Amino acid sequence: MQLIKELGANTIRLAHYQHDQYFYDLCDEAGMVVWAEIPYISEHMPNGRENTISQMKELIVQNYNHACIVCWGVSNEITISTKDNRDMRDNHHVLNDLCHEMDKTRLTTLACYAMCGPFNPVAHITDLVSWNLYLGWYVPGLFLNDLWMDFFHLCYPNRALGFSEYGAEG
C-alpha cells in the first residue's frame, strides 16, 4: 500500500480474481477507490455462465461492506478470443443486473481491449466502460490513446469512460 501511496495513486483496480480481505481493509483505511472484478477474462465460455454468476455473487457478498469499493467489474478483455455474440452479451446483462440487484449503491464496469471497439454493444452494458489500451507501447504513437478517448467521447459524450490498463503491461 505504501508504494501505491508514494506513486500518488488513489484508485486501484483489483483485477481478475478475488483478493485477500487484508488488502481491502488497507484500502478502506487509506481511503482508496477500488474496482473489484471477477475472473471472466478473454474468452466467453457458453457453459461457464453459472460460474461467472457464482463468482460475482461471492465477490459482492464478501466485499459489500468495504467502503473502498466504487464499482464491480464484470469482465476483462472478453472480446479478445470471443467474437461478439448474443450469449456473451446476455451473460454481461445477467452479471450487470445481478450487481445492481445485490448492490444498488455501486456502479458496474468492464475492461475492454481495443479490438472491442467503441461501437461494440458489449461496451455499453455496464454503467462505466474502461479500455485496456497499449497504444504507444505495443504499437508506436502514444498520442493514439488521446485520439481513441477523444473519439469515444465525441461519439458518446454522456458515457463515463476511463483507462483500465496502459503502458508496461498495465
Language-model segments: residues:
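Substrate-binding/catalytic cleft of secreted carbohydrate-active enzymes
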Residues: 2-4, 11-170
